[in-house]
Regions:
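Flexible, glycine-rich beta-alpha linker
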Residues: 112-114, 137, 161-185, 209-210
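Active-site Tyr-X1-5-Lys
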Residues: 133-166, 185-196
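Conserved Rossmann-fold NAD(P)-dependent oxidoreductase catalytic core, especially the SDR/UDP-sugar
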Residues: 4, 90-135
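Short-chain dehydrogenase/reductase
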Residues: 82, 86, 134-146, 176-184, ...
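NAD(P)H-binding glycine-rich loop region in Rossmannoid oxidoreductase-like domains
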Residues: 46-86, 98
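C-terminal substrate-binding subdomain of Rossmann-fold SDR/epimerase-dehydratase oxidoreductases
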Residues: 11-16, 20-28, 192-314
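Conserved catalytic-site region of short-chain dehydrogenase/reductase
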Residues: 70-71, 106-121, 137-143, 155, ...
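Adenosine-cofactor binding site in Rossmann-like domains, unifying the SAM/SAH pocket
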Residues: 26-51
Length: 314
């Protein structure tokens, strides 16, 4: 268990996941949280990361920093996604180990699992078959971080754990028109279509892929829970165990936003993985479950979007 006064470093505190973890830690009474902006500490510069850890000596680390993006971004910047994420992860994890960090939690992504993995996907299906090509570079980087944590545990007896969230959404998301994930992209497009009186919007694919979505504050709650209650080499899936089609999601976002125009589909564009549902029985058996249903989470996300218009420019 983390002491309330323990020094806790949250890497990536300005992102959606990192900021949610900071909120959750504060909500639970942890009062010695340290953070650094990218300007203050470039996590891709090994010397700077080593210096930071040597000086600050954080007892616990939540590694939520990452370069993320949707299908378009992942296809256009394969090398960038792989280099940035692998470099960042190795620098932070290695420096944490070198400086006696008591426990580290690595945040991954469900895209690490094979494209055609049996559904729902168990933690044990990792590396059993081919990855989804549209985000292969990012997935390989995340697998490397996960495995490095496991290997440190096995070789040096560290207590480094990993969490693999399903598709996330919520406050402080990235609403960039081409470099965002599906929920923020749909929120922005539906909102702009409503405001501008656009009669129809066109979405990629045919709307058939099945997806699962977890509100980011629920993930943050699980992250703190696992830091206090879980140790092990195998990752832990984070999700709701519920799924819906992209078409159903698009219609639900339109409902929440208040867009009443027509939704069309461009089947010449890629769908991505046909189905992605996590088996969350491991987290459930540990005593955790999500709280926020999708429609309520989308409503909260849209409120956040409206209250923070500059996020659409990121």
């Amino acid at each position: 268990m983390m002491d309330k006064n323990a020094k806790i470093y949250v890497a990536g505190h300005r992102g959606m996941v990192g900021s949610a973890i900071v909120r959750e830690l504060q909500r639970q009474g942890y009062n010695n949280i340290i953070t650094r902006t990218h300007k203050e500490l470039d996590l891709c510069r090994q010397e700077n990361v080593e210096k930071f850890f040597a000086e600050e000596k954080p007892e616990y680390v939540f590694l939520a920093a990452a370069k993320v993006g949707g299908i378009v971004a992942n296809q256009e910047a394969l090398a960038d996604f792989m280099w940035f994420n692998m470099t960042l992860e190795m620098n932070v994890i290695h420096s944490a180990w070198q400086n006696g960090c008591k426990k580290l939690e690595f945040l991954g992504s469900s895209c690490i699992y094979p494209r055609m993995a049996p559904q729902p996907m168990k933690e044990s299906c990792l590396l059993t078959s081919e990855l989804e090509k549209t985000n292969e570079a990012y997935a390989l980087a995340k697998i490397s971080g996960l495995k490095y944590c496991e290997f440190l545990n096995r070789q040096y007896g560290t207590d480094y754990i990993s969490v693999m969230p399903t598709n996330l959404y919520g406050p402080n998301d990235n609403y960039h028109p081409t470099h965002s994930h599906v929920v923020p992209a749909l929120i922005r497009r539906s909102h702009e279509a409503k405001v501008n009186g656009v009669e129809s919007v066109t979405c990629w694919g045919d709307g058939s892929p099945l997806r699962e979505f977890l509100y980011v504050d629920d993930l943050a709650n699980l992250c703190v829970f696992l830091m206090n209650h879980y140790s092990g080499n195998e990752t832990v899936n984070a999700g709701t165990g519920k799924e819906l089609t992209i078409k159903e999601l698009t219609e639900l976002v339109a409902k929440v936003v208040g867009y009443t125009g027509k939704i069309e589909w461009d089947a010449s564009k890629p769908n991505g993985t046909p189905r992605k549902l996590l088996d969350v029985s491991k987290a459930t058996n540990l005593g955790w479950t999500y709280k926020t249903e999708l429609e309520e989470g989308l409503r909260l996300s849209y409120e956040d979007f409206l209250n923070n218009p500059m996020r659409a420019e990121r």
